[in-house]
């Protein structure tokens, strides 16, 4: 017996792999997007600090811009440095 496939519709899904489920700044889910973005994905990436905390890129950039003197992680207050 042979089976012939006449039509095939592929479906894919993606998820960010992060320590938490929600951004510590905006409290939105990582599999969604930050309040500044309309659609989740590459335009709203996640970024990690050397302290291992993770945030939406736009959220942490706003947070760091608001810090006048020293830029600290909003979760642990260590000096913020992006993980490479």
From Swiss-Prot:
Changing residue 53 to S: Greatly reduces autoubiquitination activity; in isoform 1. Changing residue 37 to S: Slightly reduces autoubiquitination activity; in isoform 1. Pathway: Protein modification; protein ubiquitination. GO terms for molecular function: cullin family protein binding; G protein-coupled receptor binding; ubiquitin protein ligase activity; ubiquitin-ubiquitin ligase activity; zinc ion binding. Changing residue 44 to S: Slightly reduces autoubiquitination activity; in isoform 1. Auto-ubiquitinated. Zn(2+) 3 binds at residues 34, 37, 44, 58. Zn(2+) 2 binds at residues 51, 53, 73, 76. Changing residue 58 to S: Slightly reduces autoubiquitination activity; in isoform 1. Changing residue 76 to S: Greatly reduces autoubiquitination activity; in isoform 1. Its main location: cytoplasm. One of its GO terms (biological process) is positive regulation of mitotic metaphase/anaphase transition. It comes from the Eukaryota. Coiled coil: none annotated. Belongs to the RING-box family. The mammalian APC/C is composed at least of 14 distinct subunits ANAPC1, ANAPC2, CDC27/APC3, ANAPC4, ANAPC5, CDC16/APC6, ANAPC7, CDC23/APC8, ANAPC10, ANAPC11, CDC26/APC12, ANAPC13, ANAPC15 and ANAPC16 that assemble into a complex of at least 19 chains with a combined molecular mass of around 1.2 MDa; APC/C interacts with FZR1 and FBXO5. Interacts with the cullin domain of ANAPC2. Interacts with UBE2D2. The RING-type zinc finger domain coordinates an additional third zinc ion. Together with the cullin protein ANAPC2, constitutes the catalytic component of the anaphase promoting complex/cyclosome (APC/C), a cell cycle-regulated E3 ubiquitin ligase that controls progression through mitosis and the G1 phase of the cell cycle. The APC/C complex acts by mediating ubiquitination and subsequent degradation of target proteins: it mainly mediates the formation of 'Lys-11'-linked polyubiquitin chains and, to a lower extent, the formation of 'Lys-48'- and 'Lys-63'-linked polyubiquitin chains. This is Anaphase-promoting complex subunit 11. It comes from Homo sapiens (Human). The lineage of its organism: Eukaryota, Metazoa, Chordata, Craniata, Vertebrata.
